[in-house]
Amino acid sequence: AKCIKLGASDYLPKPLNGTILMAKSIASLEAKYFRAREQELLKELNLKATTCPLTGIYNRQVVFDKIEECFDDQKKSNKKEFALLSMDIDFFKSINDTYGHPGGDEVLKAVANTLREACGENIVGRVGGEEFIAIIESKKDKTLEEYCESIRKSVIDLSIPFQDNKINITISGGVIKSSEVKDQEEFVNIADERLYKAKEGGRNQFIYS
């Protein structure tokens, strides 16, 4: 039985007795358990490496790797253009000041869930405190403006419960198409500049140029 536990279960003498058969069954079950546990641990490690622990959406590394991949694909195969949305929750500091960090965390989770649902098959991630980026490759027959407007309205419609309160928020965004630039760094920088313009221009809007 000890040899079986050490991996000799496939080399058994004949005839077999009940003790040996039981030991083989136990060894087989143990092997299946450890294989399943190994797969679970690998999934957990992958999840930790690719997602934001608070919101469950992709983290900064995944988002920027995807941007690089999209640019590489476009250069190699003349892939259709894609867009980047750089987004920021309006007045988030005031939310933290009013409701504390637990309230702010609830807002971040609610916005992340809304963006994930609104963006569907597209990549969306949290890249900073209250900052999010979406990479739009598929708009499902919408114009880019219609797509962004649906995101903006989805966030406005949120009424986030926290303790005895309902927190209402808006979001601002800067938008850029891949056809406007030649490299990844410029791509992100211009989107951030447009986000800043959206903030300066009154918030609760997306800027496209």
What are these regions, as identified by a protein language model?
Residues 145, 163, 176-209:
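Catalytic-core segments of nucleotide cyclases and related cyclic-nucleotide turnover enzymes
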Residues 88, 92, 111, 127, ...:
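Hydrophobic framework residues that shape the active-site pocket
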Residues 103-123, 131, 150:
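Active-site-proximal alpha-helical element of nucleotidyl cyclase-like catalytic domains
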